Swiss-Prot record:
Signal peptide coordinates: none
Pfam families: Methyltransf_23
Protein name: Secondary metabolism regulator laeA
GO CC field: nucleus
Main localization category: nucleus
Organism per entry: Aspergillus fumigatus (strain ATCC MYA-4609 / CBS 101355 / FGSC A1100 / Af293) (Neosartorya fumigata)
Length: 373
């Protein structure tokens, strides 16, 4: 399902019929340092074309691209000062404790990598970047998670310099020499990353982790070179169905509760495309392009590509419902873990019901910082 958005045309992007893939992915990662070498059920390396580096280049972290200073020249924080903590049977990072609603353990890292794979499959023409970009530029990934996007880009463009920043230090040590990570890093705080110095800034799945999008967009704008681009990828998790009402269904109730809980914590998970475009414009961006891709939760298409995309989304959403609910529902509503697990099970049952043609929408934005006069 390709939904035309604002801006130029893209090749049709289809993301559809989720097959009932309910198994979890387990791998040989520890909680905060994934080796990415072994897997009990599925090798996480099969999610992308990248492979592990044979060994870490000793120059990594000091490599200069385009004459720019290394990311490690900025002030760094010791992750050991912010120990992880357990909540509802999951592990959460201690930096800015309580602000971010998602865990950082092995299960969560696998979930993030699954979504990355979903995006690369759904984005037909180029799974990593739509926005114009040099092959030897400086790329910044905000909220990089496991670093999988940054590593893929660094491998694709060996002359580029790619930096990922995140609250949690969960990135692998065996990344390419032209890629580096800075964590813990709060992109809502002041940056020491060089204004007017980045050729592309990328962000995906930021909804639920940002208190002020206008402030963030202004900061992104100030750090891009004139003429450079920002690209953002988000999922609107509001359930939609074109052939029946979702009133009274658990999946609709779940989303409304999640929306309410995250709004009360000042970091709403709800995504509004009109508001996003307006905020980008007010920050100074021009040439804003917006694409939308339907992500159905049921297998009602015959096309093989659509079925492939759907398999990944089915797996991604099945791994997400409980994970996204745990902290918001327990912290905001005071729900016990048993009640959270029950509503998650009810939602999964409906999401996998082939008689209910529910879908979400994937939004992809590109926005340009104008050239200097």
């Amino acid at each position: 399902m390709f939904l035309n958005g604002q801006g130029g045309q893209r090749p049709p992007m289809v993301a559809f019929p989720p097959l009932n893939v309910r198994g979890s992915i387990s791998s040989g990662f520890n909680a905060l340092g994934r080796s990415r070498n072994n897997s009990d059920a599925m090798d996480i390396y099969t999610i992308t074309d990248r492979g592990p580096a044979a060994e870490r280049d000793p120059a990594a972290g000091r490599w200069h691209a385009n004459g720019s200073p290394s990311i490690n020249s900025t002030s760094s924080k010791n992750p050991d000062r912010y120990p992880c903590y357990q909540e509802n049977g999951r592990t959460y990072h201690g930096y800015r404790k309580g602000i971010y609603m998602l865990p950082c353990d092995e299960q969560e890292q696998d979930r993030l990598d699954i979504f990355h794979k979903l995006f690369t499959v759904a984005r037909v023409s180029d799974g990593l970047i739509y926005a114009p970009h040099p092959t030897n530029g400086r790329f910044l990934d905000l909220g990089c998670g496991t670093g999988i996007w940054a590593i893929d880009v660094a491998n694709k463009y060996p002359e580029a310099f790619v930096v990922g920043v995140d609250l949690a230090p969960i990135q692998p040590p065996n990344h390419p020499r032209n890629c580096d990570f800075y964590a813990p890093f709060d992109f809502e705080s002041l940056w020491a990353l060089g204004e007017d110095s980045w050729d592309l800034i990328h962000m995906q799945m930021g909804s639920g982790s940002v208190a002020s999008w206008p402030n963030l967009y202004r900061r992104i704008y100030s750090h891009l070179r004139p003429g450079a681009w920002f690209e953002q990828v988000e999922i609107d998790f509001e359930p939609r169905c074109d052939d029946r009402s979702l009133e009274g269904l658990a999946i609709r109730q779940w989303y409304q509760l999640l929306k309410q809980a995250t709004e009360e914590t000042m970091r709403p998970v709800a995504h509004n495309s009109r508001e996003t475009i307006r905020n980008l414009q007010e920050a100074g961006f021009t040439e804003i392009d917006h694409q939308m891709v339907g992500l159905p939760l049921n297998p009602w298409h015959e096309d093989e590509h659509e079925r492939r995309v759907a398999r990944w989304y089915n797996l991604a959403i099945s791994e997400s419902i409980e994970t996204m609910s745990l902290a918001p529902f327990s912290r905001v509503f005071g729900w016990p873990i048993e009640r959270i697990k029950q509503i998650a099970a009810d939602v999964k049952s409906e999401a996998f019901n082939k008689e209910i043609h529910t879908y979400n929408i994937l939004h992809i934005y590109q926005a340009r910082k104008p050239l200097a006069n």
